[in-house]
């Protein structure tokens, strides 16, 4: 029987050189390992990432308290449990913590254990993780959101918006879509060089040059699509897709430039322009009418429900509106958003909520209510590629895992190539069918 014999945690480093938690789960006949990611722009409603706070060690970012919680409290509680009982394991983890935001033991401690248990169970069952979680119907490779140009909190430049992404929607296989993304990435690098702009990359592998405006960022990306030999779509209000190979996705991370006292969106890094909620929604409406934008994530701030409603009413029928800081992978906040009719998609970050079971519950709630799900990395990543497995397991249809550089990002893309190969003729790449707008 696959009884848990030992749960071991250690402190490792993520892609930004900051400590994070890695967990090994051992049973009598299997093994699972998971490393926990960490965000730079984090929502205030996220589960708590437990840090040591000792400024003399790793600038206060150590995770030895979380590691100790795994090696003592959690290890003692899980010893002897069936590793295949994921729901019961996650229930026990939540009860051991006992707080609504996982602040006692740390969401980073709980998540590492939860994912490592799932991996150990999959190994015991002789199945890849995507098949163990998703069953025989798990066969959809996700359309990637490829973050090729960075601004905001992810880059030291003068661009307010955090991520400018390409989505290769006009292809019949994941491998062809990945090739498109790589070629556009290299075309963008050459384009930036030709203009004397920096090709240094941000946290997620996208370029981070100083530009004249936020508009220049999206225009450079569209130009690079053409230079790579692909066709960008038209604005969605003009028919949009046709025979397009690539559409644009944005993550402005609007909470990062929202002033809660003034109730204004302030473009602090560029023009200094100040917009209220209605004006910010109109700003995105204008962009969606001007550029081939298929998806906007966090177009409004995390608690600006009124702004979200205005934005959804304006463009929600033709643009995917993804809630990240708004929903934080939390079924309670998602249910609230569904009731209010705001957004039409949820970003899924496993470390925002803290257990695999809660993650799957959020995805299921979204599906049952016509919302799409985008499985996502964090800006602080590791070589762990679990989210690639989860994307296929849930048939989510979309994944957001950075640019076409940095091995912590490529680990996920390459894992999806392996899964596509394993699925063979069963593999499905949805392209534009991944969207419901």
UniProtKB/Swiss-Prot annotation:
Keyword Lyase applies: yes
Keyword terms: Cytoplasm, Glycolysis, Lyase, Magnesium, Metal-binding, Secreted
Pathway it works in: Carbohydrate degradation; glycolysis; pyruvate from D-glyceraldehyde 3-phosphate: step 4/5
Positions of Mg(2+) binding: 251, 297, 324
Subcellular localization, as worded in the UniProt entry: Cytoplasm; Secreted; Cell surface
Chain ranges passing through the membrane: none
EC number: 4.2.1.11
Catalytic machinery residues: 204, 349
Record-listed (2R)-2-phosphoglycerate binding positions: 162, 349, 378-379, 400
Cofactor note: Binds a second Mg(2+) ion via substrate during catalysis.
Presence of the UniProt keyword Transferase in the record: no
Origin: domain of life: Bacteria
Catalytic activity: (2R)-2-phosphoglycerate = phosphoenolpyruvate + H2O
Entry GO terms, CC: cell surface; extracellular region; phosphopyruvate hydratase complex
Subcellular location, principal: cytoplasm
Single GO molecular function: phosphopyruvate hydratase activity
GO biological process: glycolytic process
Cofactors (names): Mg(2+)
NCBIfam families assigned: eno
Role noted for this protein: Catalyzes the reversible conversion of 2-phosphoglycerate (2-PG) into phosphoenolpyruvate (PEP). It is essential for the degradation of carbohydrates via glycolysis.
Record-stated family: Belongs to the enolase family.
Name this polypeptide is given: Enolase
Provenance organism: Prosthecochloris aestuarii (strain DSM 271 / SK 413)
